[in-house]
């Protein structure tokens, strides 16, 4: 059975389409109209090694919050659909990723339960990257977790510069996601018998 999904989310603020194939290579440059966010979505696709296509528009004349959050929501919905009953997946993934002075650690559980623990919000991260801050990243990941049924822990072990923090976290998230969606058995990875 193909592990694919296509989801569109349209509101008065945004119009986002995500196509996802968990067993294919990345296929398109993201196109949301926000340069740095597109760069991060490209990193997500490349480092997860998943077939991810994201396009959309948003009210960037106000600020990027709605676009970034709604993209996380839509990606989470697409992942949940593509995983189906989650039978056979590894379920867990984790990764450490350095970027210059920054070191990020991300741990992911595709448990069906939504939770985000996002340490960088309690730290003194400074600056932004093309108008994207670590707070925007938090909202992207929160939207993803809430709609994918995922538990995600994000720790920052070193670094405070926003560009490097965002990029290291996004790449660590991608690598954890790659491992968690991998099919490694034919059983459901739960002692409860359901996820």
UniProtKB/Swiss-Prot annotation:
It catalyses: D-erythro-1-(imidazol-4-yl)glycerol 3-phosphate = 3-(imidazol-4-yl)-2-oxopropyl phosphate + H2O. It is found in: Cytoplasm. It comes from Deinococcus radiodurans (strain ATCC 13939 / DSM 20539 / JCM 16871 / CCUG 27074 / LMG 4051 / NBRC 15346 / NCIMB 9279 / VKM B-1422 / R1). Gene3D superfamilies: Imidazole glycerol phosphate dehydratase, domain 1 (3.30.230.40). This is Imidazoleglycerol-phosphate dehydratase. GO terms for molecular function: imidazoleglycerol-phosphate dehydratase activity. Keywords: Amino-acid biosynthesis, Cytoplasm, Histidine biosynthesis, Lyase. HAMAP family: HisB. CDD domains: IGPD. Belongs to the imidazoleglycerol-phosphate dehydratase family. Its EC number is 4.2.1.19. GO terms for biological process: L-histidine biosynthetic process. The keyword ATP-binding does not apply. Pathway: Amino-acid biosynthesis; L-histidine biosynthesis; L-histidine from 5-phospho-alpha-D-ribose 1-diphosphate: step 6/9. It comes from the Bacteria. InterPro entries: IGPD_sf, ImidazoleglycerolP_deHydtase, ImidazoleglycerP_deHydtase_CS, Ribosomal_Su5_D2-typ_SF. One of its GO terms (cellular component) is cytoplasm. It holds the Pfam family IGPD.
């Amino acid at each position: 059975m193909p592990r694919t999904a296509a989801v569109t989310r349209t509101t008065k603020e945004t119009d986002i389409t995500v196509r996802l194939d968990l067993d294919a290579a990345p296929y398109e440059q993201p196109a949301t109209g926000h340069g740095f966010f597109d760069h991060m979505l490209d990193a997500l696709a490349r480092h997860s090694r998943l077939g991810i296509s994201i396009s959309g528009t948003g009210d960037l004349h106000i600020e990027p919050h709605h676009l970034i959050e709604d993209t996380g929501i839509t990606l989470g919905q697409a992942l949940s659909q593509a995983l189906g009953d989650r039978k056979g997946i590894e379920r867990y993934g984790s990764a450490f990723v350095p970027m210059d002075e920054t070191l990020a650690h991300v741990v992911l559980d595709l448990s069906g339960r939504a939770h985000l623990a996002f340490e960088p919000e309690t730290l003194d991260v400074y600056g932004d990257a093309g108008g994207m801050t670590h707070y925007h990243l938090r909202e992207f990941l929160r939207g993803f977790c809430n709609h994918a049924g995922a538990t995600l822990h994000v720790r920052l072990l070193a670094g405070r510069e926003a560009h490097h923090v965002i990029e290291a976290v996004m790449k660590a998230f991608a690598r954890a996601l790659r491992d968690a969606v991998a099919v490694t058995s034919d059983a459901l990875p739960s002692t409860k018998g359901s996820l």
